[in-house]
Amino acid sequence: MTITRHARIDWDEQGNPRSRDFSDVYFSTESGLDETRHVFLVQNDLRRRFSELPEDGRLIIGETGFGTGLNFLCAWQLFDECAPAEARLQFVSVEKYPLSRADLQRALALWPELSRFARQLLDQYVAVHEGFQRLAFDDGRVTLTLLIGDALQMLPQLDGQIDAWFLDGFAPAKNPEMWTPELFAELARLSAPSATIGTFTSTGWVRRSLNAAGFKMKRVPGIGHKWEVLRGTFIAWPEDVAHPPAAKPWFARPAPIGGERKALVIGAGLAGCATAQSLAQRGWQVSLLERHAAPAQEASGNPQGVLYLKLSAHGTALSQLILSGFGHTRRLLERLQRGVDWDACGVLQLTFDDKEAQRQKQLADAFPESLLHLLDQPAAEAQSGVALNSGGLFYPEGGWVHPPALCHAQAAHANIRLIAHQQALELRRVDDQWQVWSDEQLIDSAPVVVLAGAADIQKFSQSADLPLKRIRGQITRLPQTQASAALRSVVCAEGYVAPARLGEHTLGASFDFNSTDLTPNLADHLGNLGLLREISEDLTSRLDTADLSPEQLQGRAAFRCTSPDYLPIVGPLADREAFLQAYAALGKDARQVPNIACPWLDGLYVNSGHGSRGLITAPLCGELIAAWVDNEPLPLPRSVAEACHPNRFALRGLIRGGGK
């Protein structure tokens, strides 16, 4: 993997930023705002297009070169001024060298007229690392998806249709690696019919190359020191160029659901509450069904969960999901109460054996220090506040979360109606609606249903074949002592222990693949105390565990729900028997791509199987579900979305023989 680093910036005497990497300015030092508005807003006719959006409409802007965010903020300001109240703006921007938060703050201070929007951007500009990073503003009415990396590596991973392009970035002479026919072909691939484009350069070869890619470009008068700029419209993919390959039918997008924007989400844990909020923010009226009295009563109900990134140095689909999901969750948490609902105290993963030391060294070589870095034993002790036997890998942006707080915050959206004490047992399809039944009682119906009830979704015939498994886990709660208050970071080895929340530490957690009894038991409490001793004998002593009688040990048990490949199961569901019949030829030749549309169960989706990573993966997967439902750009690389797709299991079964 290539380590993404921050932009290297020099500042002139007037405080304007200049890229040291490209020897170029980020914006005109004479008329930056006017130039941005003329080149990108005017040439894409955004004032009219924003004003004419329907109440529930949206416009999607794509950009090359996020830079200081000036173009985004100007577009947001115009959208806020003239778009209907319920309309939405989605902005997707690629950036190879993101500014540090301090540099971004300094640059945006130059534009006081944008301060209301800049302040919100800065509040959310945390944990912005490599890959797809989703930021949300104004209760989700405006979203920004940053693709952190090289444009020619990131844009091919994007799945979506762009209505208007801001072709920015440093000048072609300064950044020739970006301004290429390959880039223009990606813009064409991603363009919606009649998409528009504006760019500050009027260079002849850029105009000709964009024309060759399927755009119709023309020179128009510029502004300031720009005599001319380019504007254009996407006409069609060039006839003499092979079309980019379409998604395989089993991973293609289902047809959007028209008509009533009502959805049912079954299960009010992390996955269900996140999905409900993501849909509600898009104007859907959501019924959130929960068999208990309130959200977050099962695995999402632990007093503390750890925001910990178990990454791979090799850029696997799971690692990409974790990195994007971590950033998304961290930004959500900024809106909750620190110290009660969550805390960014950092997470220290101890180097407890040689294999772990080797793994940590590989990760430290693969990722930036701002995400993770190695600490020797004295530094680890200083960071954690307790005596330790080893150093480890420190995640400064990690910490602990009170999962119920996140669930309740998400479920509190005005468009969400919680239906508690309802056990959904059966789904029936009647007149383009999904009916949810409990015994012989109809609970509710809607054109869209999302199954988010962990392994319980296997009781529905439509999802019974999904290979979900339960793993019992038990945590132990220990009262804080005056001495244990020294613990300043979450510390992990085979188990974990968190700094106290409301006078209690959480430690755990057991893994039991066989038990189905959720009654907390002494054996697992003692096992958790053993994990604590492996972390720190000093902390064990500080917590006075030797003086605790068995009946004083408190905790709770719940089932983690995971899949065989440890990736969550997220996306639209197909009719399994029809799927096996439609693609039976794959059993003889896995290279075939039958020209047969996938037999979707229209309007039925799943968000489950997050295992012990739900805090990191479930919220972003709620956004992924909403993108599938509303035909939006996916918030993850297409390859990662396919790796999480429910159809992957039936597909593997066919290829390996028989679909079983």
Curated annotation (Swiss-Prot):
Its main location: cytoplasm. Transmembrane segments: none annotated. Catalyzes the last two steps in the biosynthesis of 5-methylaminomethyl-2-thiouridine (mnm(5)s(2)U) at the wobble position (U34) in tRNA. Catalyzes the FAD-dependent demodification of cmnm(5)s(2)U34 to nm(5)s(2)U34, followed by the transfer of a methyl group from S-adenosyl-L-methionine to nm(5)s(2)U34, to form mnm(5)s(2)U34. GO terms for cellular component: cytoplasm. Its EC number is 2.1.1.61, 1.5.-.-. It catalyses: 5-aminomethyl-2-thiouridine(34) in tRNA + S-adenosyl-L-methionine = 5-methylaminomethyl-2-thiouridine(34) in tRNA + S-adenosyl-L-homocysteine + H(+). The lineage of its organism: Bacteria, Pseudomonadati, Pseudomonadota, Gammaproteobacteria, Pseudomonadales. Its cofactor is FAD. This is tRNA 5-methylaminomethyl-2-thiouridine biosynthesis bifunctional protein MnmC. It comes from Pseudomonas savastanoi pv. phaseolicola (strain 1448A / Race 6) (Pseudomonas syringae pv. phaseolicola (strain 1448A / Race 6)). Pfam families: DAO (PF01266), Methyltransf_30 (PF05430). One of its GO terms (biological process) is tRNA wobble uridine modification. NCBIfam families: MnmC_Cterm, PRK01747.1-2, tRNA_MNMC2. GO terms for molecular function: flavin adenine dinucleotide binding; oxidoreductase activity, acting on the CH-NH group of donors; tRNA (5-methylaminomethyl-2-thiouridylate)(34)-methyltransferase activity. Residues 1-235 are annotated as: tRNA (mnm(5)s(2)U34)-methyltransferase. Keywords: Cytoplasm, FAD, Flavoprotein, Methyltransferase, Multifunctional enzyme, Oxidoreductase, S-adenosyl-L-methionine, Transferase, tRNA processing. The gene is mnmC.
